[in-house]
Every structure is written in C-alpha cells, then in structure tokens.
Amino acid sequence: MRIMFLNHSFVHHSATLETHIRKLLAGYASPDTTFELAYPDDLGGGAVLSLLEERKALSGLHHILETPALVQKAIEAERSGFDAVMQSNTFDPGVEASRLAVRIPVIGLLRASLHFAASICDRFGLIVPLETHMPHTMRLVQAYGMAPFVCRMKSV
C-alpha cells in the first residue's frame, strides 16, 4: 500500500525531521506499506498565515485557507496511484473537501483519534497547542458527533 502523508503547510520540514517522520510512520505500518511525504503548493494563503502567526491569532482560519491546495494535492495523489492520503495535521484541514474530490480514502488524524479513543473509553480529554485553537477544535468535535465523549479540553 502506498500512502501520501500530506503536510498541511507548504513550508517544508528539514531533512532530519522528514527522516524522523518516516521512521515513526514505518513503525505503525505493515512492511509492505510505504509513506511518501508531500507538501501542498502555496495558493496564496501563505501571506495570511504569516500575519496570523505574527498576531498569535491561529484560530482555524489558516486551515480553511489551506483547503484548496490540500484538495489539489489529494487529486494529484489519486492520479499518481496512491492508495490513500493521510493528513498530517490534527485539525483535519481539507479532509472533508478532499473526500468529495477523490475516490481514495482521505484520513484525518483528529477524527480517527477521536473514534479510536471512544472505542476504548467512555470519556476523554483533549490537549490543543494554543488556547485560540479551542473553539475550532470543539466545532470539529461537534461536527464529528464526538462531543458527548469529550469531558475536557485544555491548551498547553
């Protein structure tokens, strides 16, 4: 199986970090599964992202702005023969829109993690990187129908 591990940002990781990510992914997969790291093109959201980062106002808008580039990359993955796309960002940017555009599975880590947690316990908490992420995260949790399982959310 060949899976595209799609970074949400057009900013490329260092070679050292990419090697580390590949090792982590290989540790979770069967021997015949390969992961290829991919990055979307900057279709104009980069300037807005930089401004939001400067203001420390990352509220989810930046993920919405990334969606067209992520959908474009999912279409490219399907055309290139990938069996699936896995979104690297835990806020699942572009996942729903990409699912509408392709016939291969597009996996969002947040949704997959929420459902896994709900399969092994009745209630769980979430940790998000910034307090400004909390409203967007809760909207996603509610959209996924998982709010009854989440007992608390905290930023680090």
PLM-predicted stretches and their roles:
Residues L37-A38, M86-Q87, V106-L109:
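General beta-strand structural signal in soluble alpha/beta enzymes
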Residues R79-N89:
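Periplasmic-binding protein-like
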Residues H8, S88-F91:
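Short, well-ordered beta-to-alpha junction loops that form the rim of enzyme active sites
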Residues A97-C121:
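Short, acidic/small-residue loops that bind anionic groups at enzyme active sites
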